[in-house]
Design a protein with these regions (language model features):
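Conserved functional hotspots at enzyme active or ligand-binding sites that engage polyanionic ligands
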Residues: 1-104
Length: 104
């Protein structure tokens, strides 16, 4: 997870945490961007959101929103927050499958 300063002109926050969801091959490639899921303090309990919190390196309870994927420049991913646990990563994988309507 990374905190990104000024993520977009439409985002009211000065910074936002994002989780990189691109595959490692893309992350390690010469492509300049990666796909990320934003983290918001709102949690609606839907299957495409993954609850995260202090135990994941955040200041307060939040959720990863897999329905709102964005492409971010790799150069903006400089403020490392932390990694997801294996259990949380499995929850994220399931939420991504649901959000993208992918079976398997």
């Amino acid at each position: 997870m990374f905190r990104v300063a000024n993520p977009s002109t439409r985002d009211p926050k000065r910074s936002r945490v994002f989780v990189v969801v691109s595959r490692q091959l893309l992350i390690d490639s010469n492509f300049s961007t990666v796909i990320c899921a934003p983290v918001y303090t709102k949690y609606h309990g839907i299957s495409t959101q993954v609850p995260v919190g202090v135990e994941d390196g955040l200041k307060h309870d939040s959720s990863i929103h897999c329905d709102e994927l964005v492409s971010l420049p790799k150069t903006s991913l400089t403020d490392y927050i932390g990694s997801l646990s294996a259990d949380r990563l499995n929850e994220l994988k399931l939420a991504m499958k649901i959000a993208l309507n992918v079976e398997g």
